[in-house]
Amino acid sequence: MRDEIKNLTIEAVIDKLSQKKFSAVELVKSCLKNIKEKESVLAAFLSVDEKLALQQAEIADQQIEQLTKDNLPELIGVPIAIKDNILVEGMPCTAGSKILKNYIAPYNATVIKKLSQAGAIIIGKTNLDEFAMGSSTENSAFQTTKNPIDLERVPGGSSGGSAAAVAGGEVICALGSETGGSIRQPASFCGIVGLKPTYGSVSRFGLIAFASSIDQIGPLTKTVSGAKRIFRAIRGIDSNDSTTKVFPENNKKTLSLKEIRVGIPREYFTGEVDKRVASLVKKVISQLEKEKVKMIEVSLPHTKYALPAYYIIAPSEASANLARYDGIRYGCPAKAETLSDLYFVRNLFIVGWIL
């Protein structure tokens, strides 16, 4: 089973569990063995709670015995990893920073409560760029996560630990958070599916904030249908998050390709786009046209302002959100013998951040 985990989807797990092909306990033990075997190379996890995972698996097996398949919770027995900026009661939550190295979450984030209600099994907490600020997971204060497809490459970030854990066959799926690409970019780098939900559709209560007006929690999975299943489980209004709202239900299970309209923004195919990327996107457009999908050229003239706006909003909100940690603990000293050396090291960090 350990070799199967890399290719097991959420739907396959639920089917096999309900058919008694294997138990939730067996599945979790296989995940834990894979983590022990692969972590020395991948470094996707910051903490793993074997005892909690096995307890949850036993509960899942009991429910599977007692309930019919149609009455089982939506994510029954599915092992999931959680980005380490989302609070899970009793587990460490570091946000990839030594400032929070010994912080233990005193309560569950709303998404964790909802995952538990849906029957998911929490395996552990995944690595991230410090306070979710980064795009490579090289900026974690603890370790550098590798891309399981190519160990010489980064997994993306800041949810790189979650993406690597799923793509590397350590867990079936994971939660990440996104402000400016932190779910979708690592999902792309690792060859899996990432969804940043519409702002307000998923509660941020229990998420260590980066930029509050942009942050969202979302799934990283192997299939689109798996992402949909997790999104269905975690979405909804929350009295603890005033930005959440009720969105209209889309009860239609599937759409005919002929019913779909896809916009092609002309501004996205400028000379700045990598030729290989543009070529692949154009191939997809051709394939969709062959399937009778309606392709419509649109204009998004304000797109060019998106990045400058992001770099005004995100640092401003981050400085306010992270001010609460100021003075909690002294930072790690740089290795420098003189003040000039210290200035040099500091300037290297600043230049690297700007680039």
Which residues does each predicted region cover?
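A short helix-breaking turn/cap at a secondary-structure junction
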Residues: 196-279, 284, 340-346
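Short helix-loop capping/hinge segments that flank enzyme active sites or metal/cofactor-binding pockets
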Residues: 75-95, 256-265, 316-355
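Acyltransferase
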Residues: 24, 28-29, 58-61, 273-299, ...
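Short, basic, low-complexity termini and linkers enriched in Ser/Thr/Gly/Pro
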Residues: 59-74, 250-258, 350
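Residue-level signal for inorganic ion chemistry
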Residues: 31, 53, 108, 227, ...
